[in-house]
Amino acid sequence: ALIIDPVLEKTDQYILLLNQLDLRLVKVIDTHIHADHISGLPELRDRTKCITLMGEHAPADIVSMKVKDNETIKIENVNLTAMYTPGHTNDSYSFLMNDRVFTGDALLIKGTGRTDFQNGNSYDSYKSLFDRLLKLPEETYVYPAHDYKGENVSTIGEEIKYNPRLQVSSAQ
């Protein structure tokens, strides 16, 4: 099994679900250093001996693996492609798996991650969104790290059409 962007307060729930489904946690990925919650990555590593992973720009020393842009991560018969998508933070990565993308906070449902703290940069965010994520096929499912409105999945096409933060004509 793989968990992306785990929250510390939910590690017991993750472990319970893994046990109920008789799964072994192989890897845990954080898409970026989070300011809004404490990552469950170290706790899951300690409790399951899984491999921990972040992008190469992450200033974290708790991970066993750092990936580069366009690098493929293999988990059993599943491949994820790392996509460097800075802007929300300078260490933000998204992960593409077939017809779905896990965007961390780079692209939220009908929103985008803030760029006013944690080495965020609005121009980098614009480039990550318009030159990377929104170039994916419109039917690609979007799974952000969290959503403040209770939604947990969208598509690139829906975001292009309905996301108010994407209704801009330039990076200005």
Q: Where are the regions that the model predicts?
A:
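Generic anion/oxyanion-binding catalytic loop in active/binding sites
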Residues: 3, 33, 114
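Active-site HxH/HxHxD metal-binding segment of metal-dependent hydrolases
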Residues: 8-84, 161, 165
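Short, conserved glycine- and acidic-residue-centered signature motifs
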Residues: 7, 37, 118, 122
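Metallo-beta-lactamase
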Residues: 79, 89-170
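Hydrophobic residues in well-ordered beta-strands that form the structural core
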Residues: 4, 52-54, 103, 144
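Divalent metal-coordination and catalytic microenvironments
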Residues: 5, 32, 44, 67, ...
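Conserved beta-strand hairpin/beta-sheet module of binuclear metal-dependent hydrolase folds
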Residues: 1-24, 94-104, 110
